[in-house]
Amino acid sequence: MRHLINNDGTPFETSELQSLRDELDALDNDGRTEYRNQNASVIAQHVAVKILIVSGPGTGKSYLFLNRINHWYQQDAQAKVLVTSFVRKLVADLQNDIDGDEQLSDEQKGNITASTLHKFARSIVEQNHGTTDWRFQPHFRIIGQFWKDVVWGDALAFYPLLNKGEYAWKKFEEQLYNAEFEQSEEWAKLKEIYFKLCQFYNAAGFADLILRAKDALVENSQLNESNYFIIDEYQDFNSAEDALINQLVNEPKGLLVVGDDEQVLYEKLKSGKPTLIRNLYQNNDYANGMLPFCGRSSFHITKTAGHFIQQQREADCIEKIYLPIKTTDDSPKVQVIACATAPTAVDYIEKFVVDNKTAIDERKNKLAEGEEKDAFLLILTPAKEVNFYGESKKKIAKIVAEYQVENLYFSEDYYKILSYYSLANNPQNNFTFRKILFYEDIAEAKVHELIEGAMQNGQNLCDIDSEEIKISLQKCNAIKTIVETVGATIEEKIKSITSHISIVDKVRLKEDIARKSINQEEIIEIEHKEEEEAELEEIEVKKMGAVELLTIVGSKGLSADHVIIIGFDNVNMSWITKNAFYVAMTRARKSLHILTALKSGGARQSNGFLDQLPDDHAEFYSYKKTDHTKNQLQGKQGFKTYLNNLNSMSQQRR
């Protein structure tokens, strides 16, 4: 049986893939493991300069990355490697693997950079001080999720007659993602003033950061120190990111691109384009490879996910092989659970946590000690706030809170005080000053007047002769004095600060200051942490606790022993794509639970994805809160009938 790589760059033929799938599926456990390892080894040591790997969920791409890097160093001891991904956890895990690799010398390890694309772009733009058209001062800042709308509001203020709905930030952000701008006079003016504001603030948003990095590389190719590249999650790249990568990897000594067009998640979040990887698959300059065996998820989970993604496939989708690494195992079938109400669903979750408390506590300790990196349980939701569960969402939050790792990031109150303190130390920082004007609730018209005056006169905001500016600076200096008061307790400092600015959560603020005091030595590190948090908000990935509540989109790159998907109904999951649900299912290693709760957000039936689940590898149950029991139903039809009966009973009671 041949290995899954086409030297000539041609796509795999459908008929051959089917034959190979049948042959691979006929292998026993040892045969599957042997083939997986040999296939990955052949790909890792392949002579092709450019390789595209189609890699389904949990098929071992991290091992392939490390093996390919080792191969490159065997061929070229002076190689300089860049690995980039959207998923910070994957970057961190790969860095740990590199650090522990005994085949690589310390010098070689030092020549490997594993980074998120945003962090890499930031480095390029910082080194180049922006671009020729739009220069930055050293140490430019990142415009985080919340502040994007504030800065765009500042841009719109220059053109008050424009319709804010028609010229919304989301529409401009999409133009940045696509690296393609509307040609109308109105949009051209807004683009110009936005970039002028960024220069004035010495700050950039994540979307325009990518464009700036590409232009910086065009201006100065020496900024790229790498000659071997691994590009991960290529299916989620947008046009701007693709242009940056193409500029970066121009004539590489080695290039490995990895992705799966059926795992695209960021179409809505940042205009990801699965067509990019599909087009690359047709490009004969790249040898095409495939990883066929899922070693992460259990037999039934892999079979369920594999069956699901085969249903109603897009015509231009890349055909692939996706099989479990074992012919069978002891793990349960996928559990699809019907609940009468949201409190019933939460009771199911609570019972699962109670039943597994010993194992969860053990995982919590190992995560804290760095011996484990994955959660024990992921609770995945279509909507971040879980408002569709009503009051029951508080109980979920309480369950999760018990197993959280120490909060690595700080409260809004903390960052607010940081801004006042920072401005007192560096009043020339216009972006920080803009934050203070927001916190001080200065009228929009007045803020615009101040910004416009400063920009026209080539001044900083702190140089403007204005009562609002003077009062703001006085308040900043007062807070700086309080923060630096020797001998005062944290409680005393907070009490004094509240006489100047409002504080939402004094208890959390006290914890934050106790953990990291605000002072001049710490301020750069804290501001960097704030920007890291902004990047996490951009793509929703964070450090794991033993039990985590995450959005489906936010689960990208993660895995857990057990996964519970909530909101599986006709209302709350109606906007979740097939690809996103596929990704959610394949986060699970040992067990997967899919919960439909009626009356949550108006839900009256299960999600349409129910019909695309296989009968052979999923079991369907009702669950009752009164006695905490599951009762098996007769397949999907029995599941639907049970929900319909619940609806009928509910109507009769009215």
Locate predicted features.
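ATPase/helicase motor core of nucleic-acid motors
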Residues: 282-283, 370-504
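Helicase P-loop NTPase motor core
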Residues: 52-69, 285-287, 293-400, 646-653
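Conserved RecA-like helicase ATPase core segment
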Residues: 242-333, 610-618
